[in-house]
Amino acid sequence: MRVVVQRVNKSSVKVDNEIVGSINKGFNVLVGIGKEDTIEDLKYMKDKVLNLRVFEDEEDKMNLSLKDVCGELLLISQFTLYGDCRKGRRPNFMNALGGDEAKKLFDEFVSMCREEGIKVETGVFGAHMVVDIENDGPVTLILDSKKNF
């Protein structure tokens, strides 16, 4: 499982020019599900994302987590995080999990985050989306549940 986490002041996602999800202070998270991902990958990523200490404390030190600041999550499915561009000029997406299976795991990840008491909004799985992000920092992190980077 791969995610790109962006600390935001606000973020929203539109499908067919309609806002389908929006948050205030928190994380905009692009979520890619790989062929080898399991529930254990989802649990690892949920714990990692919700507990990343990248919000400033009273001394302006990155010391607080999303949970600490009562932040919100906008989760957006993005299979292109598994794009392999090492050969040629067109990305190869062979390591991304296919549609129905990926949707099940994405939905499970959303549920797991909501169970933690976090406000969670989402895009629409498989849809063409327009994402509006007001970055804070900017702070952007790339995480991989297999710890490849």
Swiss-Prot record:
InterPro entries from the UniProt entry: Daa-tRNA_deacyls_DTD, DTD-like_sf
Biological process terms in GO annotation: D-amino acid catabolic process
Subcellular localization: Cytoplasm
Renumbered ranges of motif Gly-cisPro motif, important for rejection of L-amino acids: 137-138
Keywords: Cytoplasm, Hydrolase, RNA-binding, tRNA-binding
GO cellular component labels: cytoplasm
A molecular function GO annotation: Gly-tRNA(Ala) deacylase activity
EC number: 3.1.1.96
Signal peptide positions on this chain: none
Catalytic activity line of the entry: glycyl-tRNA(Ala) + H2O = tRNA(Ala) + glycine + H(+); a D-aminoacyl-tRNA + H2O = a tRNA + a D-alpha-amino acid + H(+)
Principal subcellular localisation of the protein: cytoplasm
HAMAP family linked: Deacylase_Dtd
Family statement drawn from the similarity comment of this UniProt entry: Belongs to the DTD family.
Main function: An aminoacyl-tRNA editing enzyme that deacylates mischarged D-aminoacyl-tRNAs. Also deacylates mischarged glycyl-tRNA(Ala), protecting cells against glycine mischarging by AlaRS. Acts via tRNA-based rather than protein-based catalysis; rejects L-amino acids rather than detecting D-amino acids in the active site. By recycling D-aminoacyl-tRNA to D-amino acids and free tRNA molecules, this enzyme counteracts the toxicity associated with the formation of D-aminoacyl-tRNA entities in vivo and helps enforce protein L-homochirality.
Assembly: Homodimer.
UniProt domain comment: A Gly-cisPro motif from one monomer fits into the active site of the other monomer to allow specific chiral rejection of L-amino acids.
Protein name in the entry: D-aminoacyl-tRNA deacylase
Highest classification ranks of the organism: Bacteria, Bacillati, Bacillota, Clostridia, Eubacteriales
